[in-house]
């Protein structure tokens, strides 16, 4: 949700331009305000306000601040309205300590009440403000900054990533985390910390991943990590294989359209995980049940996985929303494989569920971000190879997740024919994208709509759900996905003249029944947009608009290809409406609070 960065330079150069550059690359996490704190001339300097990054920068000139070290923050309001007063960094009473924080302090009201009785005066409505006040309290008791932070995290409850600076201990940043992401970067010019790697890729690709409760100290000479017993921890340094350019638009108008166009590459790269997946399957040959746990788009990928695994391998498979997992946890056993799917690997609900599942079952993470919490806590990992995804609405990470699931299902069931079909998917995606101008033109005709319905059967049902989600996320148009066979059980009552209905109808076993459903909505006045085979003349005669997909795309792999035009429809309607598809209102890329 919120994003934090920190930097200390080896030389006495101004750090503010770097902090501003880094924090700007975390805006995809969702934000309503931005702030920076630096240290110079024996004082902490702070600039912050609510609003878009470019607007606040124009007003405050955020790059023009003295000092060679500092911290920065983009805030996504959870406690207190979006305002200058509630934006980070927050300080103690005499502004000797500044703190940025991502997460939620669950017991902040209790702490605030106690500190108020001790004479502390609070200025904001946030939970975060108790942190600098606690640090001040412990530093007044003669603890240094590191140990004051340690004492503070012994008091606070919840999920957090925290970075703090003190004017009484210059040239030092102290950070810690619990159940919120935090990485540390080692660069040629300095040392960095951030909520996510795209923020610091330009400056550091050698990364340290602090564990829960560890204290990280950054100074001009390097990085030191202490465990909860104050012992120095020798951390392994990983190198991120993403390049800074991967996190840039590279000439596209938006990240989302860039990432849609990168999907064939994402599939090709993820196919390289085949041998790793085979090793995992060889090691879990005694499983009797599979349970997917996911949220949002990853949940739809999981539903496709259920269809594949049950139909091909005959293994009973459940799909559970991560936020609802606790109600099913007592059904797990040592013959259950629990698969956690997450783009970020930091989704709070999934991490809570993973900790529970690890106690009884085998666990597997399918994750895009290397070194994320799920990759470190799951027993097995499949690394999708989509590269950094900046747009809030998932596109290329969805097809990369699907690719991993398809490989898993094909190898688990020893289905050689499916493996051959998966290899064709990148070319099918590239071919579909060749019709991008046609899709753009007719998508604009649908921006009048207040409601959309998406219909699919079998493997195409999760695709319908995902298409509807993409529409809702970025166009702000109400969209619902349904199993086409459920039309008569309620949704048909909502069909009126001119309502757009998207029908996903690849050739295969479900074709005839889906065509009957298409005719049902058409006869009631719906404006039918069908996605089907290029050689389907009957479909072209019955639908109002048809997006033609290569006839060689078989029904079983249709989810990997047919989703592409649905993403494009949502994108182009959004652009026509004048919205920013990369930063939809009220949404964040990485949901790190429950």
What are these regions (language model features)?
Residues 1-249, 253, 262, 268-269, ...:
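Conserved short alpha-helical segments that host acidic/polar catalytic motifs at enzyme active sites
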Residues 68, 72-85, 268-282, 305-341, ...:
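Glycine-rich oxoanion-binding loops at beta->alpha junctions
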Residues 127-130, 301, 305, 400-407, ...:
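Catalytic-loop motifs flanking and including active-site residues across diverse enzymes
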Residues 156-190, 447-473, 508-510, 515:
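Acidic/histidine-rich
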Residues 185, 301-302, 319, 348-351, ...:
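Extended hydrophobic-aromatic, low-complexity segments
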Residues 256, 262-267, 271-291, 363, ...:
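Active-site phosphate/pyrophosphate-binding segments
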Residues 282-428, 457, 504-549, 569, ...:
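Glycine-rich phosphate-binding loops that contact phosphosugars or nucleotide phosphates
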Residues 527-529, 552-594:
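Generic C-terminus detector
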